[in-house]
């Protein structure tokens, strides 16, 4: 959402940035939302330009032309309660976006680490991830001056990410074991993906 800057609560933008979502001085948006954040923000629907976004946590609803509507299967209601002890214990101010989300999931009772690192290899202009097991893949990256990245998956899917200089987590989608994911940039810059 973009708002006139005097109407915007800057703390919301700072929160979005701290957990890997896109936020700035006069805007914030859901780019970078993981399933945990999507559930907490009650993001029931996703509009995409990719016909292959259906996966174990998102189902296809409808499509028209090159626009597709998907429904997230796990969404909390608009109003929900969180234990005050969790709120007090979750200090994300000195954590990177992945650790911040893992800490929140742990405080909420998750038995396992929610987001784990997958090895990747980066060279000038391209990063590669070899997926070892079926998983929903997200990527973070070092600060970059590149403004757009393109994802190419060995099963034929592609996705473009714009305004990546804003520093949000990349939603690479659900991938099966043996899939190769390439993230390319046209600036021939080395973008380290983790």
Language-model-derived ranges and their functions:
Residues 1-194:
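Soluble catalytic regions of membrane-associated enzymes that act on cell-envelope
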